[in-house]
Structure formats: C-alpha cells, structure tokens
Amino acid sequence: MPWLQLKVIAPRRYVESIENALLAAGAASVTLQDNADQPIFEPGLGETPLWDNVKITGLFDAEIDTAKAIALAERRFGNPLPQHQWEQLEDKDWEREWMSNYHAIRCGERLWICPSWQEPPEPDKINLMLDPGLAFGTGTHPTTFLCMQWIDQQDFTDLEVIDYGCGSGILGIAALLLGARKVVGVDIDPQALLATTENAKRNQLPADAMPVYLPPHCPATQVDVMLANILAGPLAELAPTLSNMTKPGGKLCLSGILSVQAQSVMDAYAPWFDFDPVATHEEWVRLTAIKARA
C-alpha cells in the first residue's frame, strides 16, 4: 500500500500540539526524530526528553487530499504549520527489505550471531541463530557486541549464569552454547521473556536450560557469572542485588554504559568487585570484574 509522509520541522515546545494536529488530520501514525545531531543520554526518573528541534512525520494514505489535510492540521494546531513538506513513501516489501539489511555478525574466535533466514558464514563455528523482534539485543548495538566479545573469550563449561535484563536472550543463549549448565533470564518486560524463550528454542536448547522470570519472581540463587546489559542508572541501583546473586569469585559483565558513566557504575560495585580494565567501543563501555572471595 502506498503512503504519503508529511514532515514538519518544529521547536520541541510545539511537538505535542503538532502531533495531535496530524492525528486529527488523518495520520495513521506519527514519529519523532532529531532534526540535527543532538544526543539525548539516559533520562532521569520522570523525564521524557526531546531534542531542541524535532522532525515530526505523519504517515497518511496516498489517496488523501493533501490540501484538506493541511487545513485540518492547521485548524487543530491553531496556526500555520512550521516548515513542512509532503514526500511519497516508496511502496516496498518492508519485511524483506529489513531482512536483506540484517547480516551475520562475528563476535570473536568462536561466536557468530546469524539471522535464522541466512546460512551461517562459518558452519563449524558456534552460530547463535536469532530472529530480531520486539526485544532489545541483536548484536548490532555496541553494548551487545562488547558483551558477546567477552562471552566468546570465557570458559562457561558447567557454569550457572544469570542474564539480567535479558531482552532477546542473546547473552544467556551464547553462554549456553558455550557450555553453561543453566542460565536464568530476568527482565521487567514480559515481551522480552517471550522473545528469550523463542530464541532459546530456535537454537535447539532444552526447555529447562533457560527459565525466565520477572524480577520479583526470580529465585534467590547465586551464580558463577552475572551478565547485565541494561543502562547505567538501573545498573548502579541494582549493585547490591546483583552482588548478592553472584558467588564469591564469580564474574561480572556489565554494559549499556556510556564512557562518561563508567566511573559511577564502578563506584557502585566497588564494595564487592575488583574490576578489570575498561573495554570501549565507540562511546560505550563494558565493565568486567571478579567478586571478592569472603
């Protein structure tokens, strides 16, 4: 089905009003994008930050009367729309287009992340078959890649692992494929738990190899390796919890952390862990550590 896009450039103070105006004019959806190159880092609690200048894009049926749509939007907005233009959205098989742009990723000497619709480039390696879906974690993000590189270098034989904030389950599944006896997946998002379970099945892992839980239901246990690729704020808050769930002498691998946030996260875990040198990829870091023995 062909579509038209109405793109409006506006200061952030007008975003909500213009978004509502486009929906009132018949937009099927509205998306917001940065109109410059302004980064937004992790927000504080209760904050919903936006860029100073925002590109607001409304998606309309190609048969719409564009002049009428503009008139309806401006009536709802109460003023002429700021800088705007219509664009034809090419009619494509978007699923096939997306699939063609997602490729296998090598994560070290042993591990590959492979989309399930492609043949693994190196069939004799350990190939984690993944269908990226609604949950975070495909290997393309620097934080996931950093964690996967570290996992590739470890001996997981017969170890127990927690993947805290499991997303797609990619980190925990990699540990299982490298010999871990059991991995527990934990996430606040039920969709992530479903994605993890489906991806574990896709990799032909036993049904009981990776049980998944919402945090309140996670069993009280201690594991040999703690993996957590989330965000700096939650990681710092979770330091006592993740420490209690890690055995003395156990390993910790954290990411989802910007370089400028690394020290504050390390400080939160310092009472329990001794850190290795920081690993960096682009503006992101990976922190690894050993829990001090009692």
Curated annotation (Swiss-Prot):
Organism: Cellvibrio japonicus (strain Ueda107) (Pseudomonas fluorescens subsp. cellulosa)
InterPro entries: Ribosomal_L11_MeTrfase_PrmA, Ribosomal_PrmA_MeTrfase, SAM-dependent_MTases_sf
Keyword field contains Transferase: yes
Catalytic class of the enzyme: transferase
Catalytic activity: L-lysyl-[protein] + 3 S-adenosyl-L-methionine = N(6),N(6),N(6)-trimethyl-L-lysyl-[protein] + 3 S-adenosyl-L-homocysteine + 3 H(+)
GN (gene name): prmA
Role: Methylates ribosomal protein L11.
Residues binding S-adenosyl-L-methionine: 144, 165, 187, 229
Protein name stated in the entry: Ribosomal protein L11 methyltransferase
HAMAP family listed in its UniProt record: Methyltr_PrmA
Alphabetical keyword list: Cytoplasm, Methyltransferase, S-adenosyl-L-methionine, Transferase
A molecular function (GO) term: protein-lysine N-methyltransferase activity
EC identifiers of the protein: 2.1.1.-
Similarity comment: Belongs to the methyltransferase superfamily. PrmA family.
Top-level taxonomic group: Bacteria
Main subcellular location: cytoplasm
Family matches, as CDD domains: AdoMet_MTases
Listed GO CC annotations: cytosol
An example Gene Ontology biological process: methylation
SUPFAM superfamilies found in the cross-reference section: S-adenosyl-L-methionine-dependent methyltransferases (SSF53335)
